Amino acid sequence: MIKFVFQTQFSGMAKIKLQNRTFVPYISNEEIEKAIDRVADKVNADYAGCTDVPVILCVLNGSIIFTAELLKRLTFNCELATIRLSSYQGTETTGVTRKVLGLTVNLKGRRVIVVEDIVDTGHTITDLTRILAEAGASDVKVCTMLFKPAIFKSTIKLDYVAMEIEPKFIVGFGLDFNELGRNLKDIYILDE
């Protein structure tokens, strides 16, 4: 796992503006891809030779790009499912998780790998773990692209973490600011 702290020098990456906010370069696509490679290697090692078909649960919308990149690297049979939860309004977490779109597959007796874009306070992943237990999942692992350990308040274990970051608001590679910026190949941090 790599820990990222804000740096001011990035070659080829410029500031961007989304609505009335300015974001500056934070993590390059090259670093993101390397981190995904490392996480995929760990997941593949843990699931090598599995005889069941684990469910890869993509948490919409933020983890779509991370999930797609991770799936391309997995070497075992798996099934893709989605769920959509919401806990953000603008740049702030509300602390309240809403289920916007329910599970798309029956999880009773199944092993599940939750794929998240970012874990910060841990409220959403805690609520999701409860939802999956109620749905009958036999085992739940959590894989996140980004983790903010400085503000994490949950006891949930994060099994696979690609990168640790500061508790700052970011966009890009699936993460958004009011639904904008998901398509950016790099990750940017709010210029405060």
PLM features: residue spans?
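PRPP-associated nucleotide enzymes
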Residues: 2-192
